[in-house]
Regions:
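Rhodanese-like catalytic fold shared by cysteine-dependent sulfurtransferases
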Residues: 2-34, 42-75, 84-167
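N-terminal glycine-rich beta->alpha transition that marks the start or flank
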Residues: 38
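Short, surface-exposed ligand- or partner-binding patches at beta-edge/loop junctions that are enriched
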Residues: 78-80
């Protein structure tokens, strides 16, 4: 694996942890030279993931429980969203006796920016709140209080809270 001592695509670094660029990581994974361990939590992976056989999901929150399932003799690339959690897990794996570990420099964001394969259920742009889309009249909520022809017919003094009544 083509690794470096310093990251190029992220700021967070732990001395002793090696980094690998997304393109080099993809080549190593595709050629069965390494396995990719995704340490993002399951809810993150359900939104966006890498559709390759050599990708294992071992969330950071349970990584210590998963150590028996990770072979110490294989080359391991660790990935998270931006490279911070994966650096920490790569460091942990080294301390636990895994000699061939590298952090995916820049994380999943760098992987996507390199236009490598991934699947997503998120919209192409935006944060998911649809605020970047054109607002169309049929998508707007009609609030009767803001409509004078309707709100003039409502007697707000007689409105009361509906309570659960037991019979």
């Amino acid at each position: 694996m083509n690794t470096s001592e310093q990251p190029k695509l992220q700021y967070f670094h732990i001395v002793g942890v090696k980094h690998i660029l997304p393109g080099d990581a993809f080549d190593a994974i595709k050629n069965n030279e390494a396995v990719l361990i995704d340490v993002r939590e399951m809810f993150e992976v359900q939104l966006e993931y890498i559709p390759l056989e050599q990708v294992l999901n071992h969330p950071m929150s349970v990584i210590m429980d998963r150590l028996p399932y990770i072979a110490k003799d294989q080359k391991i690339i660790v990935i998270c969203a931006h490279g911070e959690r994966s650096v920490k897990v790569a460091n942990l794996l080294q301390y636990q006796g895994y000699p061939k570990v590298a952090n995916l420099d820049g994380g999943f964001e760098a992987w996507k920016n390199a236009e490598l394969p991934f699947e997503s259920v998120l919209p192409v742009s935006g944060c998911g709140c649809h605020s970047s889309e054109n607002r169309q009249p049929e998508r707007l909520i009609n609030n009767p209080v803001n409509n004078p022809t309707i709100s003039n017919k409502i007697d707000f003094k007689k409105i009361r809270r509906i309570e659960n009544e037991t019979k």
